[in-house]
Regions:
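Extracytoplasmic ligand-binding site segments that recognize negatively charged/polar headgroups
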Residues: 186
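Gly/Pro-rich cap/lid or specificity-loop segments adjacent to the active site
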Residues: 2-183
Length: 186
């Protein structure tokens, strides 16, 4: 795992209570107050990482991960890195190629994230893609026996939206002890 996540030394940014607040921010801010709350929660995230993981936080980021890959490449004795990256991994691969162009072997970047795009542009593109994928799913499901979203794809999309709206109001219990909210389900 890249430094700072999962089975590497994880960066500690938020307490459980703060993480709950962060994860449960309204996924569809509709009012100025909703947007302000989302921005406020998001702005507190980064500084808390620096406060709670002062030794690790300054060494987290894509260029560090790319450099770690180069160390691994060297340790296994390869002259060039052969790499398969998906989603964010495509950004890691592109960064590696930029930092170490003479050490690039074969790169497969599947579902490439354009490093020139802003986070807002990436998010917008993903939202459009997810919307298309959801409609395609309900179209496929409509042709199957006992499709839970029904035989009308648009109505199926609405059925899913209604379920998420219900979960926003009435979170579902989960084995983790944290309820499943609409923010976490989307």
């Amino acid at each position: 795992d890249p430094r700072g996540v999962a089975d590497s030394t994880p960066i500690e940014c938020l307490t459980d209570r703060q993480l709950d607040r962060f994860l449960n921010v309204d996924p569809n801010p509709e009012t100025d107050e909703d947007v302000a709350a989302t921005v406020a929660v998001s702005k507190r995230f980064g500084p808390r990482c620096k406060t709670n993981s002062p030794d690790l936080a300054p060494n987290i980021g894509t260029p560090f991960v790319a450099r770690d890959l180069d160390i691994l490449r060297s340790l296994v004795g390869d002259e060039k890195l052969n790499y398969l990256g998906k989603s964010y991994g495509t950004f890691i691969g592109a960064t590696y190629a930029e930092l170490f162009p003479s050490r690039v072997g074969k790169l497969v970047l599947d579902g490439a994230v354009d490093p020139a795009l802003t986070n807002a542009e990436v998010s917008k593109g993903q939202a459009i893609g997810f919307e298309k994928a959801l409609l395609r799913f309900t179209e496929w499901c409509a042709g199957e026996k006992d499709c839970p979203t029904g035989d009308d794809p648009q109505a199926g999309v609405q059925k899913i939206a209604d379920l998420l709206a219900d979960v926003e109001t009435n979170p579902l219990p989960a084995d983790t002890g944290r309820p499943l909210t609409a923010a976490q389900a989307t």
